[in-house]
């Protein structure tokens, strides 16, 4: 990722630059099994947020990238609970590791305007209270944000409900969006 957060005396400042992109990242599922459950949960929530904050865009004609983002979201939704239930599940960690890499490398933002409102809100909250883990803060902010903005583009949220969360197939877009947000919680 080209992004970082600097925390200093109760404030958090986000920065972004190609100059801070790592030259290499080693994604070794054998190492993930030692993570505490709270950090597994927080990491999964951060992955979901990184994709959603690109996916929930009003930019048109992003079908290919949308499909890839939806596949990554489905993977994280499927395997996140599995690694939490069994941190030694190597195969599930392989899926999470790859999906997480794509979630953070910017590929799902290709050709679209991105919205980082949830991250901006969460940085303020955890800057004020440093005991709040970033991903845990996002787990609270994301569904609330979704509920507040889904009326702006109900079709996008209905697509998310149907294609990612597997709900709302027979509902109109507004109802499907509400079902998808509830399932996401």
Where are these regions (language model features)?
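Active-site segments that bind and position negatively charged phosphate/pyrophosphate groups
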Residues: 54, 58-182
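A glycine/threonine-rich phosphate-anchoring loop and its flanking beta-alpha core
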Residues: 1-64, 159
